[in-house]
Amino acid sequence: MSKLPLLPTTVIGSYPRPKWLRESIRLHKAGKMSNEDLQEAFNDAVIAVFQDHYKAGVDVPTDGEVRRDEMVEFFAERIKGFKFYGPVRVWGTAYYRKPSVVSKIEYREPMLVDEFTFAKSVSYTDNLKITITGPYTIAEWSYNEYYRNKKDLVFDLAKAINQEIKNLVEAGAKIIQIDEPALHTRKEDVSWGVEAVNEAVKGVNAKLVMHICYGDYSFVAPYFNEIKVDQINFALKIYNYKPLELLKKYGFDKELGAGVVDVHNRKVETSEEVANDIRKILEYFPPEKVWINPDCGLKLLSRKIAYQKLVSMVEGTKVVREELKRKGYSVD
């Protein structure tokens, strides 16, 4: 990793696919585009995402996860033991290809290494983050038709994820984020769910981040310091930063990835709004322990709005950096 400024800015992972990529995917599904041309479209989309992140001034970018349709489906298609029966309605007219576990979970082959290798080759910085869905979330968002209990399923998934993470490190990954938005879904699972995350990152030599978002953090908060990652990033903006009191109560001692952009609201935050929110966060945590990010992935927004939100996030962060510099902090 290269040196980062104080209050590094990053993204959670996903970013809107360009319209032309969505059209390319449609044509490919209709048999009107070759596999080779589709891969070229994916590669071009990754370059476009990096261009947006670079222009916005993001310190730690991702490739936007543009090759992945969904965060669970992608991995279920590549890990042995899953089967898809058909789409399941989530709400209204929205459907999700929910996977079913029908046999023992086994790691097959690298799932993200090619994706990461290409991203690394076109990234504007070596401070590149790669994301992977965590074992608990994959299990919680799947049907279990094989394992006697969910815990056994989750720990087998943790072993598979661990192997993938180690392959990413071998390929040169320096910052790896485990996405666990479902970890705080069921209070009775949290203690061993945390153990499963630790199993997934066991023996990994990289900067490790965990992402958690939306829901009640209260019954997972006592376990945050037990999770063997360097940083946990949270959705905070949508909750008006109320979880900061909870984190303070339990002596949160890791780097805080602070969500300052609402990804479910098309209204673009102003840079001053972001700066004010960061000042609020710094009342609870020292700037050396804080990273700045959106609440969650940006894929559900239009590309224009997602980009504008990142610009405001970065500009607001710069305002606070300058204030800290005047107070004697080293910000570069």
Swiss-Prot record:
PANTHER family xrefs: 5-METHYLTETRAHYDROPTEROYLTRIGLUTAMATE--HOMOCYSTEINE METHYLTRANSFERASE (PTHR30519)
Cofactor needs: Zn(2+)
Gene behind the chain: metE
Enzyme class: transferase
Binding-site positions, Zn(2+): 211, 213, 296
Cofactor: binding comment: Binds 1 zinc ion per subunit.
Residue ranges of the TM segments: none
One GO term (biological process): methionine biosynthetic process
Keyword terms, alphabetized: Amino-acid biosynthesis, Metal-binding, Methionine biosynthesis, Methyltransferase, Transferase, Zinc
CDD domains membership: CIMS_C_terminal_like
Pathway(s) of this molecule: Amino-acid biosynthesis; L-methionine biosynthesis via de novo pathway
InterPro entries, A to Z: Met_Synth_C/arc, MetE_arc, UROD/MetE-like_sf
HAMAP family in the cross-refs: MetE
EC number from the UniProt entry: 2.1.1.-
Family to which this protein belongs: Belongs to the archaeal MetE family.
GO molecular function: 5-methyltetrahydropteroyltriglutamate-homocysteine S-methyltransferase activity; zinc ion binding
Coiled coil: none
Free-text function comment from the UniProt entry: Catalyzes the transfer of a methyl group to L-homocysteine resulting in methionine formation. The physiological methyl donor is unknown.
Keyword Cytoplasm attributed: no
Record-given protein name: Methionine synthase
